Amino acid sequence: MLTRPEIKAYLRRIGIGEIQPPSLEFLAELHRAHVSAVSWQTVDIVAGRPVPIDLDASVRLMLENRSGYCFHLNGAFSVLLRSLGFRVYRHRAGVQPAGQEPRLSGFHLGLTVGLTDPSGQEQRYIVDAGLGDMPFEPIPLQDGTYEQGPLRYQVERSVVAEGGWRLVHDPLASFVGVDFAPEELEDIEEFKPRHEFYSRSPESPWHQLFLVRNRHAEGSHELRGCIWSRRDANGIEKIEIRSKSQWLEVLGDVFREHLTAYSRLERDELWHCVWKRHEEWKKEKMQQSNP
């Protein structure tokens, strides 16, 4: 649990001024603020400086104006919510990338929050600050379709997790869906081998992929290497970033990532690494289009 000064510091990080009693309205405010202010990212992985996913380490990332990916983001968010008096449940989950089958791989830390309704019954909500292409607000853990801005989500029973559920993402999203196991996890120990693979293995999809994402009320942003994608109700606009100054400006202004843990020299090295891979990617695309 966080101390009161830590709670206040965390809330300041995401732009919330006052502590409130647990409620659906406050939960939604916290969720919107978190996914807007704290990006999902692979920065430390690409830089070769992965951060442990222990809950204390994940909270420190937030308090130091840094970020991470699902294990860090949902881990820290779950601690904040519990410290504010919410009933939070952690779950083993698996993200289904495009072109692959649904799976319960344990490569995602899922969260639900229980709130007591006027009849005294607990109503569960899916909350997720760690999907990258995440929902903007909590989603009721009930079968149905839910629209948030230009994105549409569907909740249904999982076919790979007995007694679990599935969140189907919008057709234009970066992944197809995510399946959740119903069992509650008291700690995140079982995720540590997955984190070790994702953060250090050459086979990891994030090993050399600089990727930063966040949400806002009208859509989402993504910076994949040097390609900035802006998605809203009108579609997706892609912008190629061709200078370090513009790249750092987009990181700071759009994603609120100022690379505070990196020196000027390290930021230069990171940019050159990302730019080099971007040029290699463009060359590969050109060769594929002109065999």
Please give the residue ranges for each predicted region.
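N-terminal accessory/pre-domain segments preceding catalytic cores
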Residues: 1-24, 83-84, 160-291
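Secondary-structure boundary elements
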Residues: 1-65
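Generic structural "secondary-structure junction" signal
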Residues: 40-47, 64, 133, 141-143, ...
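Short N-terminal helix-initiation segments at or just after the protein's N-terminus
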Residues: 49-60, 151-159, 173
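Hydrophobic/aromatic-rich core segments of domains that either
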Residues: 75, 79-155
